């Protein structure tokens, strides 16, 4: 019989039934860790809605949705938590009802204050913080706070067909399920493969591992001038540099590129591309000019993919199961593929 939930982190019968498939997938202990975790999610546009949905369904203890902006006419195109007729309402408040209905067992809260006004003490109540729609300065500042207080930090965004995620888990320990290697008994001769070790898929063992992450500031400020870095440049996805351009645009304009001002924003993006890549000592040709055609607005399918990946990484980090992405994940909707890149000091 499953015990009722206690302060020690037990799972009630009702929760065991609700999360039965997940418990079978990653185990009871992992689900207990998840049920004891509180997450802060900043930014409730399309990507934020996907992340919120996935975390609530996964069964975290609590989710605080923070957004000080109002719902715009464009938001419902990718934000499914907002009801029709919500334009002008606070974005987080407009998302609360549908978010809570996804899983009544999760404590879903709303905060309408600007993230930039929050003191360091605000963040210490959470086990993980996930930022979307934030400026580079805010991303760096909150990451530093989380790193200092051993809070798991995530950030991500969607720009048109492109999306990214980043994680800084500090020194992160996790367990990974490995298939046992079974040696063939001596004297058994059934072919040339008998001398090799074989994998027995019916037997597995849990292996403890540790990985160390770098701060987002270091990951965004890679020095590409060294010979080693120049060699690595050939293997680095251009989406990393596209992210630098889009974050600079957001800083300069206080918003993301908009289809309402397509011509103006396209010209500015090209100028920022030249400035950013020149400052890094990299040829602008690394990011072809046609990138401006594919980075406007949030696209619902891209939000679904990136939001699924980002929420999955948060769940893995909180449950301490399976290797995390270290540290960037980039998704290209035009090519239909994603790539994990580890960027920062080596």
UniProtKB/Swiss-Prot annotation:
Residues modified to N-acetylvaline: 2
Gene3D superfamilies, sorted: NAD(P)-binding Rossmann-like Domain (3.40.50.720)
GO molecular function, one term: small protein activating enzyme binding
Main subcellular location: nucleus
Subcellular location: Nucleus
Residue numbers of N6-acetyllysine PTMs: 198
Expressed in which tissues: Expression level increases during S phase and drops in G2 phase (at protein level).
Stored Pfam families: ThiF
Record's GO cellular component terms: cytoplasm; nucleoplasm; nucleus; SUMO activating enzyme complex
GO terms (BP aspect): positive regulation of protein sumoylation; positive regulation of protein targeting to mitochondrion; protein sumoylation
Pathway note: Protein modification; protein sumoylation
Residue list for modification Phosphoserine: 12
Modified residues (N-acetylmethionine): 1
Keywords, sorted A to Z: Acetylation, Ligase, Nucleus, Phosphoprotein, Ubl conjugation pathway
General function of this protein: The heterodimer acts as an E1 ligase for SUMO1, SUMO2, SUMO3, and probably SUMO4. It mediates ATP-dependent activation of SUMO proteins followed by formation of a thioester bond between a SUMO protein and a conserved active site cysteine residue on UBA2/SAE2.
Quaternary state and interactors: Heterodimer of SAE1 and UBA2/SAE2. The heterodimer corresponds to the two domains that are encoded on a single polypeptide chain in ubiquitin-activating enzyme E1. Interacts with UBE2I.
Family: Belongs to the ubiquitin-activating E1 family.
Protein name (database record): SUMO-activating enzyme subunit 1
Organism this protein belongs to: Homo sapiens
